[in-house]
Structure formats: C-alpha cells, structure tokens
Amino acid sequence: MSTPFYVSPQQAMADRAEYARKGIARGRSLVVLQYADGIVFVGENPSRALHKFSEIYDRIGFAAAGKYNEYENLRIGGVRYADLRGYTYDRDDVTARGLANVYAQTLGTIFSSAAEKPYEVELVVAEVGSEPEGDQIYRLPHDGSIVDEHGSVAVGGNSEQISTFLDQRHRDGMTLAEALKLAVQALSREPGGGEREIPAERLEVAVLDRTRPQQRKFKRIVGRQLARLLDTEAAGSTPTDAPSDTEDGDSTDGTDRADGTTDSTEETEK
C-alpha cells in the first residue's frame, strides 16, 4: 500500500490563502473614503447591472471585490440578516459591526473547511453616523478576519499601492468632489507607476450621505450628477450642496435591497 501524501496544516492554510489572494487580485480595485457628509464608494465597473456596491440597511453599505457570484451570495445573506434583526428587535440594533461579525464567521468557516474552496472575495462594510466621529468602516479579507479602518480603504487587485496613495493624501473634512477626485486618481494608478484615464461611464459611485432627510442614507451617484462632480473638481471649485435626490439619472437604491438584484448567476470576476 502506498503512503498517503501528507500536507501539513500550515502549508494547507498557506496554499488556500494564496489561492484566494490570487483570485481577488484578478478583480478590479475599489476604494471607500470618508468625506465631510458621509462615506463614498468608488470603483471601476463597466457593467451597469452587476454592482460592486449595495445598500444593506438604513445606514449600512456593502462593497466587494473578487468573484461576483460569491460576494453576491454574501450580500443577499447580509440583507436578510439585517431585515430580520431590525424587524425582531429595533432598526437601531442593526449595525455594521454586527454585520461584519456575521460575515467574519461565514468567511472564516469556509476558509478553514477542507471540503470547500475558500471564497475569492474581500468585503467592506461601512456605516455612516450622525457625525463623522460615528462613521465605521470594516474590511474583511478572505480568511474572515476583521480590520477596523479609518479614513480610507482599498480592496481588490492593486489595493496595496492604492492604499499607500490614499493614506498620503486623504484628509478629514473633504468635500464629496474632493474625495471623488482623490479616489479616481488612486484607481487610475498602474502597478508600474504610470497613470491611465478612467472615463465617467466606467465608474460606479455611491454614497452614504448623513445629510439625507430619509432614514435610508444610501444613494448612487450616476449620470449628470457624477459628471458634474467630476467637472466641478476639475475646474478647481467644490459644490456646496449635498447630492440631490431628484437629479436626472440618479438612483436612491433601485433594486439593491431585493434578493433578485441581477439576472445573471455566472461566475463573473469584477
């Protein structure tokens, strides 16, 4: 009888981590930034149907990089958890920290299970507070660990270089246009040190805006409003108004809260 091939637990975990990291690195990067009136999500995404950013609950947003079908399952699970907890207890009992703990348990269990391949995803869960000091941003890598982030965070393919760029330039109290410009500059940087142009139609942008009168603070920035923000900052000035809910081409949340948000179930790496 031949001797079974032995792999140490340490080597097995290292191989699984490397597999997950390579899968995540194939996806496009995204950034999440705090600004004066909330939190902005910015990523390069040519698809108008397969979103990287979504609303989870009133003040909570979700961002993900990696394999689409895997993080979409996690997003739907998060929506169900938040709705059930808010209905059973109170809407204020639904927090980003609680949701991050649920995601961490799920990712950690899958990562350590030899019967399943690790998820090729990296998540960001963000909650906007009534004041900037109350904002919360949590990053969840493939292994289920939780990292409490402040100011800015980048996940996806070129995240290390982008994070360094953001850490050097992000500051408290930025306007939405300033934060958006910084995010686009960071995403435009190439691994070799060069820079490329990302047109507005390839950008996916959303905000958690604490100034919105509605209970639900999540809003997508698209169309003419996105173009105006980019053009305003390029001209060297900053807008004074919060994002309008009536701007043509904008969407407050569309179908983000529904379980059937997309028509595609293919394994799309974004």
From Swiss-Prot:
HAMAP family the record matches: Proteasome_A_B
Biological classification of the source: Bacteria, Bacillati, Actinomycetota, Actinomycetes, Kitasatosporales
GO BP, sorted A to Z: modification-dependent protein catabolic process; proteasomal protein catabolic process
Domain of life: Bacteria
Function: Component of the proteasome core, a large protease complex with broad specificity involved in protein degradation.
Major place of residence: cytoplasm
Protein name listed in UniProt: Proteasome subunit alpha
Family per record: Belongs to the peptidase T1A family.
Record text on subunit structure and interactions: The 20S proteasome core is composed of 14 alpha and 14 beta subunits that assemble into four stacked heptameric rings, resulting in a barrel-shaped structure. The two inner rings, each composed of seven catalytic beta subunits, are sandwiched by two outer rings, each composed of seven alpha subunits. The catalytic chamber with the active sites is on the inside of the barrel. Has a gated structure, the ends of the cylinder being occluded by the N-termini of the alpha-subunits. Is capped by the proteasome-associated ATPase, ARC.
PANTHER family, alphabetized: PROTEASOME SUBUNIT ALPHA/BETA
